[in-house]
């Protein structure tokens, strides 16, 4: 029996070491197109550059969190003209699970007077895998990321987490900043693009599905802001009319968000032409200029930005 236990222990240690070596070789050598159950390629939306920058920032008036709608939709330069300092904590496909994480990690340090929680309803129905991989691939690995990874529970995520931990320590592989040509990173976490890509004007009708896990995380994140006495507003940034109209339960989604706090759906406030969009889901710079001006005006009338400006 002792011999069996010893052999089993030795075999387990050998397999574990072999697995680690295999993941390191796999992540270093295998091209992204051939990767299976592994993804450490990231490069979407300058996530690494954004979170490297925020480590050097303190005390801003406004923080924005959310998906690519956030980092492509809120330009710090426009807010600065109104006397508002801001930082954008958006990341690619950021679901409520990750929004709660990034706010929990940075809001105490940034000490914002207001948080804009940008919501893209589609991401309330995902498992959070894509966004989690993006954060890990950008060097964000701590006990909370590990705990969240176990909650999502995906083999691809575990492999990426293992490689990411080694890469943070030994710098095996350099991570890209962005895959998208024509994108420019602007200090404060924003990604600027003047491009306008052709996109489909007709889409299949569908419903937005909200998972209980994502909704629970969203509510928990808002409650954590309340517990720190940080004011927040929930914002749905505009996306193309054809895309928005394809969802049949938009009013139901509005009721969900309205029940959780001060909420504005700018798909119903603005009616921007397709030329103002980078693609069917994101504004380009011309659209951002109009959207941000309207947002500042709307929230100023509710007393938010007026108070911030008076405090500066």
Where on the chain are the PLM-derived regions?
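Membrane/wall-proximal cationic-aromatic binding patches
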Residues: 22, 26-87, 91, 95-102
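Secreted/periplasmic serine-hydrolase-like ester/acetyl group-modifying domain
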Residues: 132-230
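Hydrophobic membrane-insertion alpha-helices, especially the h-region
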Residues: 6-28
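Residue-level recognition of beta-strand->loop/alpha-helix junctions
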Residues: 90, 236, 265-267
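A structural signal for isolated positions on well-ordered beta-strands in alpha/beta enzyme cores
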Residues: 63, 116, 231-233
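Membrane-embedded segments
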Residues: 65, 69-149
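C-terminal regions of proteins
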Residues: 247-312
